[in-house]
Amino acid sequence: MDCEDRFVLTDLPSEKADGIVTNHTHRCRGCAGCISSNKGTCAIDDDFTNIIPEILSHRVLEIRTGIRDSQFRMPMRKAVERLSNVLQAFTDAGGNIPLDKDSVALREIDIIVDGVRTDGFETYARELLDMGPVEEVTFRYE
């Protein structure tokens, strides 16, 4: 696969990442603008908001992070929850008229976990990310 078609998002120290999630990433406020008034766009003003369009413009999102209590650890959890809400704009969630999946490139999410597999994590991650334009979510543990 062409490297240009992959966006690497991490909360781990890395020089190879395209986007780094920091403690300055805010939690979703629940305004639902991403599925109603500003479909596919997050209303929060922080660095992660600027990364979302980049993620959607690549065929593959590679998430590199650790897990805690069978969930993404902070701050990645905040970022993934917000991305999940944006992905809902491409579904009929809440009676929404979905955005066209072909308007974005994203189709696959590869989650590379720094640690060992824990019960429930993959189900949790798929519930958040396997929707809208995403056709496949895969996992690897290092």
Residue ranges of predicted features:
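N-terminal beta1-alpha1-beta2 submodule of the flavodoxin-like/Rossmannoid cofactor-binding fold
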Residues: 1-86, 129-142
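Short, glycine-/small-residue-rich phosphate/pyrophosphate-handling segment
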Residues: 88-135
